[in-house]
Structure formats: structure tokens, C-alpha cells
């Protein structure tokens, strides 16, 4: 659209749909139209944490009585442009001869992540709502924590993830000893894994 604008010097050349192709909220707006959803509609944009943040926000909306039910999730599309731009920060593994062993989170020989795409969707809802519609209840969300680094946009520190863990445990009312599984970010990058491991060790030893 911008190329056409530069060529013709006329905004009409952009087309009436170009603005919607540039907004990340278009995804959730389209889904709401497809499924006739009338509730709160927003797109969480928080880099790798976007999907987790959407689940956390859904939990808060249901917990506080603003929604009975929320469709939430996350998606990552892989294409030449997104991968090329991401590779600019030199975070990808260079083990191209070992693609199945290239991703080595928390390994001393790690050298970066392996790009991938995918999507997942969850229905987060009030217990009474789930029972009423006969939904299979797979899990209960009891707490959530979210915190940013606050000092660098791409280089993580220890305090950001540690604060997230602290808030999650505090809001859930559970102790580290009661946790049986931690789903780490685990980028396999030198600095990222080291800082994340320090944050996890602060609470789980």
C-alpha cells in the first residue's frame, strides 16, 4: 500500500482495506465477526509473551466478573520477512547441519534459538459457565504474574522474570514447593538462558 502511495501520490491507491492489514487488532476483530462474539475484544502484543499475556488477561477478566467466557491464545507466523528481521539480532542457532539438535535450552553448548510458527487457543471461563454448557474442564488458573525488564528491549535481566514468578506465586497463594512444572521461555541464547535460570533458581533452588 505504501509503495502504491509513493508511486501515485494518492491515498486512494492504498485501498480501503490497507489500514486493517497493518493493525494487529485486526486478527481478533475478524475472529469476533466470524464467531459473532460481543464481549471484550483486544489483541495482546507482548512479543514472545503475547499468548501467555492473553491467557492472564482472560483470567483477570473472568475473575473480576467482567466476562463469563473468553476465547484467548497466541499465534506466530513464520515468513521470510519476519525471520530475516529477527535474525538481525543474531539470536538464531547456526547449527544448520543438526536441525533436530540445534535448539539446546539451558545447555552449556547452546548457541541460539530455532525459529518456528504455530498457534493455540484456549477457552477461559467461569466455573459455573463451563458446567452449564457441559464443557470438559482441563485445568484451573489460580494466579498470574507479568513483569517487564525495564532496562533493555531485547537483553533480559533477572529482575523482570523473577518479579513475574513472585507475583504469580503470591496471587495464586501457593509456595514454590507446590509447583511441579515450570514452562520456561528457554530461548537457548547465551544471555537469555543464564538470566532466566537465575530467576527460576531464586524461587525453586
Please annotate each region the language model reported:
Residues 97-174, 180-181:
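Condensing-enzyme catalytic core mediating Claisen C-C bond formation in acyl metabolism
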Residues 31, 51, 58, 86, ...:
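Conserved small-residue
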Residues 41-46, 67-75, 136-144, 177-184:
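Beta-strand segments within the central parallel beta-sheet cores of soluble alpha/beta enzyme folds
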Residues 25-29, 33, 56, 60, ...:
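Residues on a specific face of well-ordered alpha-helices
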Residues 1-57, 89-114, 197-205:
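Conserved catalytic cysteine-centered active-site region
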Residues 65, 125-129, 204:
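Short loop segments at secondary-structure junctions
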